[in-house]
């Protein structure tokens, strides 16, 4: 086991995010619920932080990137996105932070480029 030089931020979707998701054109979410999204939220590695305040500083400095990643995961068209600002971000997501991240496997971590989910491939 190794301690990493990263902290982690988990963004737990809330009701306003779910309402937006359901309002998207051609979205088919019959097999998905808000609880499903909350049970398996996206997690983002950020620079290592000594405390929660430092982690929040990192989150705020990367707010556009984090919020855009969450939105693009479901809708690639920014025309359907809300304004990206801290107020909407904190309404749409509960933020959970872990300042210490340990890497248990004894092998190199792999990285792959982000690819958004295609909700309706036939649309």
Regions found by a protein language model. Name each.
Residues 1-50:
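Extended, charge-biased low-complexity segments
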Residues 23-26, 67-68, 75, 120:
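Short, flexible coil/linker elements and helix-boundary hinge sites characteristic
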Residues 1, 122-123:
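Short intrinsically disordered terminal tails
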Residues 113-121:
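Eukaryote-specific, cytoplasm-facing alpha-helical/coiled-coil scaffolding segments in long proteins
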Residues 47-114:
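Amphipathic protein-protein interaction modules
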């Amino acid at each position: 086991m190794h301690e990493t030089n990263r902290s982690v931020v988990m963004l737990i979707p809330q009701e306003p995010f779910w309402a937006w998701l359901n309002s998207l054109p051609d979205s088919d979410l019959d097999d998905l619920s808000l609880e499903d999204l909350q049970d398996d939220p996206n997690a983002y590695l950020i620079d290592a932080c000594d405390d929660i305040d430092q982690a929040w500083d990192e989150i705020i400095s990367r707010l556009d990137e984090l919020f855009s990643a969450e939105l693009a995961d479901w809708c690639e068209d920014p025309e359907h996105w809300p304004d990206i600002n801290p107020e909407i971000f904190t309404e749409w997501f509960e933020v959970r932070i872990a300042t210490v991240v340990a890497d248990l496997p004894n092998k190199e971590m792999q990285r792959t480029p982000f690819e958004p989910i295609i909700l309706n491939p036939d649309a």
